[in-house]
Amino acid sequence: MIKNRMRIFGFIAGLLSIGTLFTACEPTEPDGNEGESSKELSKGFYVMTEGLWGQNNSTLDFYSIEDGQTHLDLFALTNGLGLGETANDMIEVGNKLFIVVNGSNCIMVADKKTCKKLAMIPINQGENPQPRCIAYHNGSVFVSC
């Protein structure tokens, strides 16, 4: 009896496995993100996602009010490298974005209009500083660790 159940279970599992080989995805139209790293961003806003802890998958996306599209992981697309591990806070100062990347112990500085990386400022005071929050006042940027 148990052997028959095992055979039936094995047969069903095999059919399901084979069935997945014959599934297909529909082809998608290009989303228009190709070459977007070279154009200047205008009306819209940035969305920073912290990602999963320890996964080095923080992103900086841009939502365009003009066309209603979200341009995912724009920082990586523009710069050829990811934002880092666990982005925590972001502030706009003039034409620059200052992004606190906690797990990578740094501040990423990017151009607000193009998302191009301008600088990476390492925070290496102490054993493991882990910067968290950022503020601007009277021409200075302050970071808490």
Residue ranges and their predicted role:
Residues 2-7, 14-45:
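Bacterial Sec-dependent N-terminal signal peptides
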Residues 56, 93-94, 103-104, 137-138:
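Short loop/turn segments that connect beta-strands within the blades of beta-propeller domains
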Residues 45-55, 99-103, 143-145:
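Conserved beta-strand positions in repeat-built beta-propeller and related beta-rich domains
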Residues 54-62, 106-109:
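Structural motif
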Residues 98, 105-111, 121, 130-136, ...:
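Mobile, glycine-rich extracellular loop/lid and propeptide segments
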Residues 30, 69-82, 116-125:
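A short beta-strand motif characteristic of beta-propeller blades
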Residues 81-93, 125-139:
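Beta-rich, blade/repeat-based domains predominating
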Residues 65-67, 111-115:
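Short loop/turn segments that connect beta-strands within beta-propeller blades
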